[in-house]
Amino acid sequence: MNEARVAIVTGAGSGIGRATALRLARDGYSVVVNDLNAERAEAVAATIRAGGGSAIGVVGDVSSESDVVALVRCTEQAFGPCTLLVNNAGFAHQVPFIELAPADFDRIFAVHVRGTYLCSRAVLGSMLAKGHGVIVNVASQLGQIGGVELVHYSSAKAAVIGMTKALAREVSAHGVRVNAVAPGPINTPLVASLSESWRRAKAEQLPLGRFGEPEEVAATIAFLASSEASLFVGQTLGPNSGDVML
């Protein structure tokens, strides 16, 4: 009997996380929809179930070790061990560096970096024991090139890219693949929260001439989760409308 495919998607109540949860459900995964907002998490899970898929919503803060432990416990009780983790939870806000409060800097790192660490650590034991598993971290192109008034966010996403590479080197020989995506401007609530002037100017700069859609990033994540990406280890793919070419 084939092992059940079980995905945890953090920050899946909206945007890229929501699109990823829906895509993975269509691909045959049982999906655990994590979000800080209970209504959003359950709404996404209900949409998946209405389409014939299997899903539950689990509220939790990825920067909290106890919440992450509970998230993995709920996953295993509902569907079995996690075989795919998508570390997507995150947020951003623009602020000049000189005005960036230490508490805001720490919170960005707590969610993006500590959260990625805690969730990866929580599922890795079962993946290593079985000799297979996939982790996909959602970074950002700003982790590669930086962003004005986004020093805290850019630094955290750079750390996520570094963690992706280091962990991939450590566990790939044991059957666990770790990769990342670094989206450019995507039509999500997070990007909508940035200034209109920035969004307008950015759209004009893109070689493709448009922002991406969450579903396009979800397709990249689904590819990295698939057997077709078996040679991708420690890589950071850039669905970014041509904004960054590496």
Predicted feature locations:
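Short C-terminal tail/terminal secondary-structure segment
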Residues: I145, A222, V233-L246
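A conserved structural motif in NAD(P)-dependent oxidoreductases
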Residues: L206-V217, E228
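Conserved glycine-rich cofactor-binding loop
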Residues: G13-G15
